Each structure stands twice: as structure tokens, then as C-alpha cells.
Regions:
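Eukaryotic polytopic
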Residues: 1-197
């Protein structure tokens, strides 16, 4: 199951990195309202401020994540081959460098993705925050219809679901750690009865 989850995640990262279904999108602020256009020149012509190439940032996150997810495999193969060919010190060094790249690179990727996705331009491009004129139950459909070529709904939705899953996993992990700590404390205080070692 873990391998299936890894391969599925890697496949979606590759799809969104190399064949992203969302079109080019530039975010800009015009008179206090966010808007999306396919080119930066359109925003400059309209006098927009806070101009950001949202699509390129989202694609960069997927590309970074794709290679970040492949790094454990590539690092393991490189370390294994160098060890197999009689240079175990180099294999150990490659394994250590790969582990450092996996840990540090993964943390930076995770943080940058949150910043890019949940800043105002990312939330607007993904349809989380829409102009005041789009109200009611179908505001996302109205948003997608208003920006048919530039909305980042698909990429933004994938990123939001990914972060929701990781936050839930972090919460469960913290909860289990606290529960284990409490059980250990209770056992240390009350668990030592007669005949215990």
C-alpha cells in the first residue's frame, strides 16, 4: 500500500509538473480586486500591482516535488552501486548526502508550497477567494467560467488536498506521541506493583 501511494503521488506530481492541465496565469491587483490574465503585459496595461506568475510557481512546486520524491530512489541506487563496486565509503557518503538532500529539500519544498498556495494570489488563482461579484453556492463554477483559461483550480485543489492530508498526519503523529508520553508517565507512577522488575 505504501508503494502504491508513493507511485500514485509521484505520478500526479509528474503530471502536474510536465503536463499541467491549467493554463498560464498571472495574478494582479486592480483597484483592490484580484484578477487573472494569461500574460504579464495584460496586467501592466491595466495598471495592476502585486503582479505574480502564479502558474509558474505552481508548476515549479510540482517539478521540485517530483524530483524530491525521486531522490530517495536515486540516492539509494547510487549508494548501493558504489558499495557493490567496492567503494563502501563513497556509498556511505552518497547515502548521507542523499538523506540530507531529502530532509532539507523536502522541508523547504513543503514550506514554499504552503506559502505559494495559501498567499492571496494562490488562493485567488485556485478559486478559494473570489471577487465580491461571485456569490452564492455556485461561486466556484462562476469563477471558473470567468477565468476559463487562467484559473489554477486543478493545481490548487491538488495542493490543498495534499496539505490537508499532511496536516492531518502531523496532528495524528503529535497526538500519538502525547498519548505515548502520558502512558509512559502513568506507568512510571502507578505501574510498578509487586513482582515488577
Amino acid at each position: 500500500m505504501c508503494c502504491g501511494g508513493y507511485v500514485t503521488f509521484l505520478t500526479f506530481l509528474g503530471k502536474y509538473a510536465y503536463n499541467n492541465p491549467d493554463g498560464p496565469a498571472w495574478y494582479g491587483n486592480i483597484a483592490g480586486q484580484g484578477t487573472l490574465t494569461p500574460t504579464e503585459a495584460d496586467l501592466i496595461a491595466q495598471g495592476a500591482t502585486d503582479i505574480v506568475d502564479v502558474h509558474s510557481r505552481f508548476v515549479a512546486w510540482f517539478l521540485w516535488g517530483f524530483w524530491q520524491a525521486l531522490l530517495p530512489v536515486l540516492s539509494g541506487v547510487a549508494a548501493g552501486l558504489t558499495t557493490a563496486f567496492g567503494v563502501p565509503q563513497l556509498g556511505a557518503c552518497l547515502g548521507g548526502l542523499g538523506g540530507c538532500g531529502i530532509g532539507c529539500g523536502g522541508l523547504f519544498w513543503w514550506i514554499y508550497g504552503m506559502v505559494w498556495r495559501f498567499k492571496p494570489y494562490g488562493k485567488f488563482a485556485a478559486g478559494d477567494v473570489v471577487p465580491d461579484t461571485f456569490q452564492g453556492d455556485d461561486y466556484k463554477d462562476t469563477f471558473i467560467a470567468a477565468y476559463p483559461l487562467t484559473n489554477q483550480y486543478s493545481s490548487g485543489n491538488f495542493m490543498a488536498v495534499y496539505y490537508l492530508i499532511t496536516w492531518i498526519m502531523l496532528g495524528v503523529s503529535c497526538g500519538c506521541t502525547i498519548l505515548g508520553f502520558l502512558c509512559t508517565c502513568l506507568y512510571a507512577k502507578f505501574g510498578k506493583g509487586e513482582g515488577s522488575y
